[in-house]
């Protein structure tokens, strides 16, 4: 069962996916907008195109005739996926899922209005005047997000009326779609955030990974740990919501479903129809299969009987602090001296401030507390420099 996989997006998540695919004898063509992207370094072939250009996407599909089209990022002309499905191509997890999750408006309305899931109160704004009206309804603080963005780009937390103009400007210049409509959300005073990795299968039941806790800065993942502290009642509710939304979107693969937890409530936040950055903690051997192996097996139709927690783990990101076209790596010798720890350097060809260049991992089978594992992962990340 050797499949030709066209990977659209070739970042660090794509790289680990390709490694998983190589281990099961699959053939991968890695695509991105720049050369020497991480996944290209381990794939069989590469293509460099602007994936927001539908005509270029069509050409790549016609050239390679892949068995599977696997999106890894949001910046893709996903509207073309419907046509590819009509032509007989398998889009992962489905054309519907890729299109709905590309746009926060589509997925939020689906979750809140159609599926009646609990979410933060929200409004949309297409002008600064509409943003002002939205803040008057939702109050301060509130959160502003472009409808199309990732890794916190263009997001702001508005604390007062004086910050509205700056937040509007950021939303219009840093999102994927440029000047466009935005979503404004009430700020939920949450106790924690979790990612519930959810696996939908062609040949098996829907499975849930042990919940992953995470911490963000600038709207982007900084740390994650597994398992996260969560009550049985909250876990069941999160699983119910994740099951409902993934069933509605259809398809097979792994989904990163994010939730806010308060003392007595679980709020649906966002969803990604692919491996999730916070799920890199599974590279620490926390599960019987890491998230990339799970994604691959699900899309290939290889049955996954169960997902088990093997040990506790934590991860922390290694960020660049400067812009450099010839980055240097240092500190690996120091970092390698820490027990029950590991690291991954992604191999991105260029650095810029806050760009994620690697991840550190810590783990324990001896009952070590999550707080201790988190500290070790963060300490490890501070020792490694990629600049």
Swiss-Prot record:
The text of the family note is: Belongs to the PurK/PurT family.
List the InterPro entries hit by this protein, alphabetically: ATP-grasp, ATP-grasp_carboxylate-amine, ATP_grasp_subdomain_1, PreATP-grasp_dom_sf, PurT, PurT/PurK_preATP-grasp, PurT_C, Rudment_hybrid_motif
- Which branch of life, at top level? Bacteria
Coiled coil location: none
Instruction: Please provide, in alphabetical order, the Gene Ontology terms of the cellular component aspect for this entry.
Output: cytosol
* Entry's transmembrane regions: none
User: Which reaction is recorded as catalysed by this protein?
Assistant: N(1)-(5-phospho-beta-D-ribosyl)glycinamide + formate + ATP = N(2)-formyl-N(1)-(5-phospho-beta-D-ribosyl)glycinamide + ADP + phosphate + H(+)
Q: Does the keyword RNA-binding apply?
A: no
Carries keyword Protein transport? no
Question: Which residues hold ATP?
Answer: 104, 145, 150-155, 185-188, 193
Q: Name one GO molecular function term.
A: phosphoribosylglycinamide formyltransferase 2 activity
Task: Provide the protein name.
Answer: Formate-dependent phosphoribosylglycinamide formyltransferase
Any single GO BP term? 'de novo' IMP biosynthetic process
Q: What Pfam families has UniProt attached to this entry?
A: ATP-grasp, PurT_C, RS_preATP-grasp-like
Q: What are its E.C. numbers?
A: 6.3.1.21
- The residue ranges of the ATP-grasp domain are 109-300
Q: What class of enzyme is it?
A: ligase
Q: In which pathway does it act?
A: Purine metabolism; IMP biosynthesis via de novo pathway; N(2)-formyl-N(1)-(5-phospho-D-ribosyl)glycinamide from N(1)-(5-phospho-D-ribosyl)glycinamide (formate route): step 1/1
Going by the UniProt record, its keywords in alphabetical order are:
ATP-binding, Ligase, Magnesium, Metal-binding, Nucleotide-binding, Purine biosynthesis
Q: Which organism is it from?
A: Leptospira interrogans serogroup Icterohaemorrhagiae serovar Lai (strain 56601)
Provide the assembly information: Homodimer.
Q: Which residues bind N(1)-(5-phospho-beta-D-ribosyl)glycinamide?
A: 12-13, 72, 277, 348, 355-356
Q: What does this protein do?
A: Involved in the de novo purine biosynthesis. Catalyzes the transfer of formate to 5-phospho-ribosyl-glycinamide (GAR), producing 5-phospho-ribosyl-N-formylglycinamide (FGAR). Formate is provided by PurU via hydrolysis of 10-formyl-tetrahydrofolate.
